[in-house]
Amino acid sequence: MWHLKLCAVLMIFLLLLGQTDGSPIPEVSSAKRRPRRMTPFWRGVSLRPIGASCRDDSECITRLCRKRRCSLSVAQE
């Protein structure tokens, strides 16, 4: 009879031990974290959509920068 009690105690212990591994405790931070900004390297490397501001043709997905905007056509009225 004592082995049934021991088995029950071990099962309860194992169940409780499994619960402690469930989810991490969230860190309490007094200061809000800022989202990471894109570095100048990635800002220059990433291709921009039509209508986005640009400095030269290499920044645009269409490879056409007209009047500091990414354009779809070569000649713009």
Curated annotation (Swiss-Prot):
The keyword Disulfide bond applies. It comes from the Eukaryota. Keywords: Antibiotic, Antimicrobial, Cleavage on pair of basic residues, Disulfide bond, Secreted, Signal. Residues 23-37 form a propeptide. The keyword Signal applies. GO terms for biological process: defense response to bacterium. It is found in: Secreted. InterPro entries: LEAP-2. Residues 1-22 form the signal peptide. Disulfide bonds join 54-65, 60-70. One of its GO terms (cellular component) is extracellular region. Its main location: secreted. Belongs to the LEAP2 family. Has an antimicrobial activity. This is Liver-expressed antimicrobial peptide 2. It comes from Macaca mulatta (Rhesus macaque).
